[in-house]
Amino acid sequence: MYQVFINGYGIIGSRLATALTRDKSINLIGIAKYSVDEKTQEAINKGYKVFVPRKLIKEFRNKNYEISGSIEDAITQSDLVIDASTEGNGIKNKRKYYHPLKKKAIFQGGEDRYGRNSVADIIHNSRVNYVKTLEKDSVIQGSCNVTGMGKIIQPLIENYGQSIKRFDVVLVRRWADLEDKKEVRDSIEWDKNPHHQDDLKDFIPSANLYVDALKVPSRMMHLHQMTLRFDGRPPSKDDILDTFKNEFGVAILNNAKGTGDIRKKAVELRFDHGDTSMVHIHSELLKIQEDTLKISYSDDQTGMVIPENYMLIQSMLLKRSRAEALKQTDKIFSMKKKKKSLESEFQN
């Protein structure tokens, strides 16, 4: 049985822990905690072993938390570590633990792909380059926005690539996650140099892509507005929707009033953590004018990358084919069932 450790217990770490407990081929060693707070007891109550920095073990135990050992102890036992630590700490963990201990590691989208702080030489998107991660020891899982763009752009290129001249995408990003204690300010902010464009072109280099990013005062998902320029008349609306009909992790919805509607429906349908873990094309917003096609889709920021991280475990540890990995991922996350439920709830 393979041993996996989750280094962090925030938005991503807590969700991955839920998923991994369902996989009988994997033993979840435990999770890492860096701050003494109520989330520690939450993890213990769920049956997870908690590991903390060696220098903080006494402080945690003085608060009556049952600590199983140091983070280094857990990493030493592991076959693979999912680094779900605070953005920017991945390179520190790689230098301190993963590289010296020769451990495979999955990093999240906030870590650097290039430069002196690069943690890996590849950004993963299961729709595009799953096979290339099979022999890798270190991989970055693309961020929720980058993952969502890949799920839309790759099928379009495969079907209409010769006719597409350029992609322009405006990322309307949520300010904070639902569980976040971060203040949601009454402001709209812009990113002068969003990383999403370069990140996506890392695994789809042929895309003639231009990305702008805004941050809006909401906790309810991201919304992407994508404009495609064609060499001539674009395909019909029906043809575009047919392109995505059978795509894994892409739902086609109609008449949702906003991202909050979808999130609330996910909670109502009792999806784990209230996540859909997919992108949702809003068919009523699909527009064609002359040589231009406009697609709007919402992106589940909290759940999007969780199945993607799980896919990386299938490749890096279990060496499964993409088809086998998708089948196993659907078994754990019920992606097809969730897609069907959402499309039924938001239909014509």
What spans do the regions from the language model cover?
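Solvent-exposed amphipathic alpha-helical surface segments
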Residues: 23, 159, 251, 316-323
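C-terminal helical cap and adjacent loop that interface with cofactors, partners, or active-site loops
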Residues: 259-348
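A generic structural signal for alpha-helix starts
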Residues: 11, 147, 232-235, 304
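Active-site catalytic microenvironments for nucleophilic, acid-base chemistry
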Residues: 155-159, 229, 315
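N-terminal Rossmann-like NAD(P) cofactor-binding subdomain of oxidoreductases
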Residues: 1-178, 325-328
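C-terminal substrate-binding/catalytic lobe of Rossmann-fold NAD(P)-dependent oxidoreductases
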Residues: 14-18, 22-68, 163-166, 170-173, ...
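Hydrophobic alpha-helical scaffolding
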Residues: 6, 142, 189-190, 299-302
